[in-house]
Amino acid sequence: MRAVRCHRFAANSGSSKQISPIREVLCLEDLPLPTLHAEENDKNKVLISTHYAGIQYPDFLQAQGLYQIKPNLPYIPGMDVAGIVIDKGSDVNELSIGEQVYANTALCPDGGGGTGGLAEVVSVSANAVFPIPNNLHLSSVANIGRNYCAAYHSLKVIGNVGPNDLVLVTGASGGVGMATVELAKAMGAKVIAGVSTLNKGSLPLTAGADKVLAYGRDRKVHKQFKLDVKAACKELGHPQGASLIVDVIHGDLFQDALVSSIQPLGKICLVGFVAGQKPIKPGLLLIKEASIVGSLWGRWARENPVEFRNNMNEIFGYMKEGKIKPRADTIFSLDNYIKAFELFENNSGKGNTVISMNASQHSKL
């Protein structure tokens, strides 16, 4: 089978100052086809023929060696898999061969850093596999884990968001940001979507955002963004600020605009730090009695499998009802996988990026 592999990290010794081009560290290889045996370890496993694999910014960061979780080298990137069950262990009763499914490699017992998805055939634990409703196309669910699971965990498990809440989302034109906007609206909340530039504003508007505001890339624009958020909060009936902030950007924006935008006793949920890590000043947070909470859903999901499966069922329920509409915004063939990673290298990724794994069934781009 063919699979994408990373043999070394792009960042030298984890330094963001010396980074090789991403195409120098990833390669498409022929690897042995995984199989299931009668051994105890394989009784609860499933083999999936991968039709689509999701790629998002964390996958790019991971290949650079700059993500929170570093896999052992060499490794196959990709956490999200959508495909067809082609074999299963003797203890797997809830799935059928030929069934279309979504699988999340981060749910396997060792977690694996959420890797292994960019392969034509994937072997995963049955607890990491979820049947896909028949009305959903495989390509549309190939980013559920990186995007919708991260968003749901931030909104519901951490934020307990409901109909009376106001959510501020940064990076709202990206995969996690778009999913956060959609899910927050499905939960009945109002949403302010923050984007780097207004030319990225159409996607969160389509997802249902009540307001779209630009925070730019410099501190002058950050200050204007803070004023714009304050005005938007008042307009949306929350003069004291947002109930929850879901932040994937961090950097200077966090201190310049986000801390002042949270309501007293509110929560700021840190999902990522695309703009880098900056010191946090505690003064205003103390006065507001506001909380900063990290959001990394994989460990929680492995430790709370029943609750997580219920959460997944709720996400799929929103999909069936049309309250959220997962989609593949950009699709590349496996032969052109590097272009997907270069979208994030060039800071031009928008929405959901997907690799079509089966060249015989899916046209190349």
Place the predicted regions along the sequence by residue.
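Glycine-rich beta-strand-centered segment in the early N-terminal region that forms part
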Residues: P32-I55, L66-C108, T115-G116
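Mid-domain Rossmann-like dinucleotide-binding core that forms the NAD(H)/NADP(H) cofactor-binding site
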Residues: A142-D218
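Adenosine-nucleotide cofactor-binding segment
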Residues: K185-L253, E307-F308
